[in-house]
Regions:
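Active-site-proximal loop/short-helix segments
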Residues: 79-89, 142-168, 194-221
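Alpha/beta enzyme core
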Residues: 157-203, 215, 223, 227-235, ...
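N-terminal basic, low-complexity leaders that serve as flexible interaction/assembly modules and, when applicable
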Residues: 1-87, 91, 227-228, 327-344
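Active-site-proximal, glycine-rich beta->alpha crossover segments in alpha/beta enzymes
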Residues: 90-191
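Catalytic-face loop-and-helix region of soluble metabolic enzyme cores
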Residues: 231-344
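Active-site mouth loops of central-metabolism enzymes
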Residues: 42-57, 163-190, 286-296
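Hydrophobic faces of well-ordered beta-strands that scaffold small-molecule active sites
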Residues: 19-27, 72-74, 139-143, 203-205, ...
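Alpha-helix-loop-beta-strand connector modules within alpha/beta enzyme cores
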Residues: 120-137, 215-237, 274-278, 333-342
Length: 344
């Protein structure tokens, strides 16, 4: 793997000193960026077609480079690996799964696949990003956690309007849920290791529904999948666990991830005292970046740095940029992060 010129993020990941806290944002390439919206409009295709097109995905992934972020995350969807498994979602605008998971037979019908054969576009995106960047910035890969994917597969669409139904299914159909999560765990390990082999300098696992998962379900189903995944990943690339607004820091610390990406419910100062060697990512409120004034954003960033002491810290949001976020607020976030993130 080539030498990275802007190595701040990689240095933090390897517990090395930096001149300032690195910054990037979840969903940094997307609907808050007018250039993305224009590109998507000009392209005219559905999202799944764009995700499968390495040339366009590379172009979109690189858009945030112009605002000064310290890492590029590939433009892709957490549902991508479900297509070769026989559970592909249609984006119309979607996502829609024709047959939501309801039976053990459906779980057993999921197809094992080789990412090198069936997800060549993902490898092409990661390799293409490294070729375009020429070592300028590190490239991040990612995957949805088994439970995040299970939420979509059980709901058959975006689960946000069906949370209670999905949780009821998990509690009532424990054997189906267990089998589904076991299959998804093995698939996710292969998928993330494939990304690492394709050039990802670090990978992030998205536990996207951690904020609505009851503690007992988290302990029974979520925690074991995280531990299995992180223990099976290639050690050449650090790993990040994102748990959306989960207060269960004790469980997160047992996951085996190199970095914990935490929400507003976690104060970084006591979190660092609890685990001094852990690297934390986050955790500026995305609603402040979306709806606040520039001064509000500045103060939120300063507060975050005061909590972390600018040590073992990657500045990010509590979760992804909201669609309504003004692009000038995104630019201000990065500018102020670089200004106040200096390590003295």
């Amino acid at each position: 793997m080539s030498v990275i010129k802007n190595e701040r993020l990689l240095r933090v990941l390897n517990h090395l000193p930096v001149d300032r806290v690195p910054v990037w944002m979840m969903r940094q390439a997307g609907r808050t960026d007018p250039e993305y919206n224009q590109l998507k409009k000009n392209d005219g295709r559905s999202l799944e077609k764009i995700f499968a097109d390495p040339e366009v995905s590379i172009k979109i992934s690189l858009l945030p480079k112009r605002i000064g972020v310290d890492a590029i995350i590939m433009f892709q969807d957490i549902l991508t690996p479900l297509t070769p498994a026989g559970a592909g979602f249609n984006f119309a605008p979607g996502p829609i799964l024709e047959r939501p998971i309801r039976s053990m037979a459906q779980v057993k019908a999921l197809r094992a696949f080789d990412p090198e054969v069936d997800l060549q576009s993902v490898s092409q995106i990661l390799k293409g990003l490294n070729a375009e960047l020429k070592g300028e910035l590190p490239v991040l890969g990612f995957a949805g956690s088994p439970m995040s994917l299970a939420f979509f597969m059980i709901a058959g669409r975006s689960p946000n309007q069906k949370i209670e139904e999905v949780l009821a299914f998990i509690e009532e159909q424990t054997e189906i849920t267990k089998a589904l999560l076991e299959w998804l765990t093995l698939m996710t390990v292969d998928y993330l290791n494939f990304q690492i082999a394709s050039g990802a300098h670090a990978v992030q696992l998205f536990e996207s529904f951690a904020d609505v998962i009851p503690l007992e379900i988290y302990k029974k189903f979520v925690q074991p999948t995280q531990e299995k995944i992180f223990s099976a990943l290639e050690t050449t690339s650090p790993s990040i666990l994102f748990t959306k607004e989960s207060p269960h820091l004790d469980l997160m610390l047992r996951s085996g991830a190199s970095v914990l990406s935490v929400g507003n419910c976690i104060n970084l100062k006591p979190a660092q005292k609890q685990a001094p060697e852990m690297i934390y990512q986050g955790n500026v409120d995305n609603k402040i970046v979306a709806d606040g004034t520039k001064e509000d954003i500045t103060q939120a960033i300063r507060k975050c740095f005061e909590q972390s002491g600018r040590k073992n810290h990657i500045l990010n949001l509590n979760h992804g940029l909201l669609e309504r976020t003004p692009f000038e607020n995104v630019q201000h976030f990065v500018k102020v992060a670089k200004e106040f993130g200096r390590v003295e």
